[in-house]
Swiss-Prot record:
Span of domain Beta/gamma crystallin 'Greek key': 2-40, 41-83, 88-128, 129-171
UniProt keyword annotation of Repeat present: yes
Annotated protein name in UniProt: Gamma-crystallin E
Amino-acid biosynthesis in keyword set: no
Domain of life of the source: Eukaryota
InterPro entries, sorted: Beta/Gamma-Crystallin, Beta/gamma_crystallin, G_crystallin-like
One Pfam family it belongs to: Crystall
GO molecular function: structural constituent of eye lens
Gene name tied to this protein: Cryge
PANTHER family assigned to the protein according to its UniProt record, in alphabetical order: BETA/GAMMA CRYSTALLIN, GAMMA-CRYSTALLIN E-RELATED
Amino acid sequence: MGKITFYEDRGFQGRHYECSTDHSNLQPYFSRCNSVRVDSGCWMLYEQPNFAGCQYFLRRGDYPDYQQWMGFSDSVRSCRLIPHSSSHRIKIYEREDYRGQMVEITDDCSHLQDRFHFSDFHSFHVMEGYWVLYEMPNYRGRQYLLRPGEYRRYHDWGAMNARVGSLRRIMDFY
């Protein structure tokens, strides 16, 4: 079980709300979010209700202001607790609908283009585990949660384009 606390003001000040499960709409509990404390679990925060908009991956720790989680604003409107997974396996494809070159990955990759020699990745099949996909190399840029399942095109994971720079397993739990 996870635990996360959202604070309206920086430095863990102001009105706060404790959460231990997925929430599709946090708007009734606070109007803005400027700091977060993750006591346990790994979480994905979303700028919009219903798990939409920019996504931010947080693990156990203190985040005294939204820049600490690479946020663009103080808007956090939904959150998802990421379940524990002991094994990780993902297939990545060069083209939509699982076409083109395919590579299977079981570990983190800080620079997908250097490792696999193609720059865009249009589809994914997550066989096992939960992953964070980053728009840029070295785990930077926009973040996307990939849960077990099929992602036939970049819109399926919430991206605006097929630019993918790095991929990391979610392993740090409780």
